[in-house]
Amino acid sequence: GGSGSGETSGMWFGPRL
């Protein structure tokens, strides 16, 4: 839900770079 695309388990920031 932040700067990235890896939202898992209700996390806010999960940038999969």
Curated annotation (Swiss-Prot):
InterPro entries, A to Z? Pyrokinin_CS
Per the record, the domain of life is: Eukaryota
Q: Name one GO biological process term.
A: neuropeptide signaling pathway
> Which locations, inside or outside the cell, does it occupy?
Secreted
Instruction: Tell me yes or no: is Secreted among this UniProt entry's keywords.
Output: yes
Residues modified as Leucine amide: 17
Indicate yes or no for the key word Secreted: yes
UniProt similarity note: Belongs to the pyrokinin family.
Q: What does this protein do?
A: Myoactive.
**What protein am I looking at?**
Pyrokinin-5
Which organism does this record belong to?
Mastotermes darwiniensis
